[in-house]
Amino acid sequence: MSVTRDDVAYIAALSRLQFSDEEMATMTTELNSILHYVEKLNEIDTDGVEPLSGIHDQMNVLRDDVEKESIATALALQNAPDRQDRFFKVPKVIG
């Protein structure tokens, strides 16, 4: 399997990306290189090899919560450019 310049142009259009001719050539070459590598990986005999979901046997090893002294609210808000009551006030980001 190989990727053509038209394939890259199609994917770029779907992604709303624009590439120069030089970038288009580079992308085509790099994608073909990646596909070639994947084809090589597919040639490896993995019969009898157990699937690996992680490199460690332990999962979700977490430390215990430890309660400790925190900074005072007034001190935390001391250098805040804008605040409302006991909270930092920040500009609205989501419309």
Swiss-Prot record:
The UniProt keywords, alphabetically, are:
ATP-binding, Ligase, Nucleotide-binding, Protein biosynthesis
> Looking at the record's lineage, which domain of life comes first?
Bacteria
Q: Does the keyword Ligase apply?
A: yes
Q: What is the reaction catalyzed?
A: L-glutamyl-tRNA(Gln) + L-glutamine + ATP + H2O = L-glutaminyl-tRNA(Gln) + L-glutamate + ADP + phosphate + H(+); L-aspartyl-tRNA(Asn) + L-glutamine + ATP + H2O = L-asparaginyl-tRNA(Asn) + L-glutamate + ADP + phosphate + 2 H(+)
Q: What is its EC number?
A: 6.3.5.-
User: What GO molecular functions are on record for this protein?
Assistant: asparaginyl-tRNA synthase (glutamine-hydrolyzing) activity; ATP binding; glutaminyl-tRNA synthase (glutamine-hydrolyzing) activity
GO biological process: any one?
Answer: translation
Q: Which SUPFAM superfamilies match?
A: Glu-tRNAGln amidotransferase C subunit (SSF141000)
Q: Does the keyword ATP-binding apply?
A: yes
Role: Allows the formation of correctly charged Asn-tRNA(Asn) or Gln-tRNA(Gln) through the transamidation of misacylated Asp-tRNA(Asn) or Glu-tRNA(Gln) in organisms which lack either or both of asparaginyl-tRNA or glutaminyl-tRNA synthetases. The reaction takes place in the presence of glutamine and ATP through an activated phospho-Asp-tRNA(Asn) or phospho-Glu-tRNA(Gln).
- What does the subunit comment say? Heterotrimer of A, B and C subunits.
Q: Which family does it belong to?
A: Belongs to the GatC family.
Q: Which PANTHER family match?
A: GLUTAMYL-TRNA(GLN) AMIDOTRANSFERASE SUBUNIT C, MITOCHONDRIAL
Q: What is this protein called?
A: Aspartyl/glutamyl-tRNA(Asn/Gln) amidotransferase subunit C
Name of the gene encoding the protein in the UniProt record: gatC
